[in-house]
Structure formats: C-alpha cells, structure tokens
Amino acid sequence: MGKIACITGPPGAGKSTVCSKLREYGYNCKEGNELAKEYGCLFDEEVDVECLEEKLAEDRFDGIICSHYSHLLGCSTVFILEADLNDLIDRMRARGYSEEKIQENIETQMSSIFYYESLERLPANRIFTLYNGNIDETAKRIISIIERSRNNK
C-alpha cells in the first residue's frame, strides 16, 4: 500500500473544499465516493469500506482521500476537520439534510468520534484535528504536516 493521508469530519466541515485546494497545489487528493465507484466498491449509494481498503492496497494508492469514512481506510495520517457548529448547521440545511440528520452529525463532531475511531488504528501523533476556518491555511497546514512526515522517513 502507498502512503495514504485521510481527511475526515462531519458533512459541511470543508473536506471537499480542502481537497480541491490541495489539488490546486498539485496533490493527489480524491473524494472517497469517487474512488469507491472507480474501484467497484459502491453499492446502492453505500460504500463498502472493506472493499475500498483492499482495492487501495492492491493499487498501492498514494495520495490523500477525503470523506466522512476515510479514517477507516488504512491511513498513515488522519486529518479531522471541524467547523463552527452554526456553520455546519447552515451548510447541512442548505444541502437539504433533515433536522434529525443534522443533530446526528453535530453530535458526531461534539463526541470526537472521528478521533476515537482513528485512535483505534493509528498512534495519536499521526492524528491531527484542524479547525477549518480559512481553507487556504488549512490546506497549507495539511501540506506542512505531510511534507514533514515524508522528510522524517
């Protein structure tokens, strides 16, 4: 398996926007659902995470994956994006999420579930929680951590 950095967090935290910015900087950043579709691991709009992890290993994928489940994919580094709760609520409402789903996603961020699930797979020094305020600054911080990690190997 190649080196995979993963960007995760609740819907509306800015994962796709940060991934797009990283692509502008020349990084191989892919949306998890796009990869799942490409590798035949998307069934009825549901991603088979185990299938995707296997295909990524077979393909020796080397890059960055962003999705709310990417931290479950055998990452070497995990970046957890968090955003202001009011911003998250506004973004999810704009996407047509039900109030129940919005509450569920807010509770997910507040409970640090992404961190604890990542901690089951990686040491704490490979997990970074970033408050996503400024997209460019967030992307540059991710790049800095990735490059520092590469230089330490």
UniProtKB/Swiss-Prot annotation:
Q: How does it assemble?
A: Interacts with uS11. Not a structural component of 40S pre-ribosomes, but transiently interacts with them by binding to uS11.
Name of the featured protein: Putative adenylate kinase
Checking Gene3D superfamilies in the record gives: P-loop containing nucleotide triphosphate hydrolases (3.40.50.300)
Show the segment(s) annotated as NMP: 31-47
The record's EC number reads 2.7.4.3
What HAMAP family is this protein classified in?
Adenylate_kinase_AK6
At the highest ranks, the source species' classification is: Archaea, Methanobacteriati, Thermoplasmatota, Thermoplasmata, Thermoplasmatales
Nucleotide-binding found in the keyword field: yes
Gene source species: Thermoplasma volcanium (strain ATCC 51530 / DSM 4299 / JCM 9571 / NBRC 15438 / GSS1)
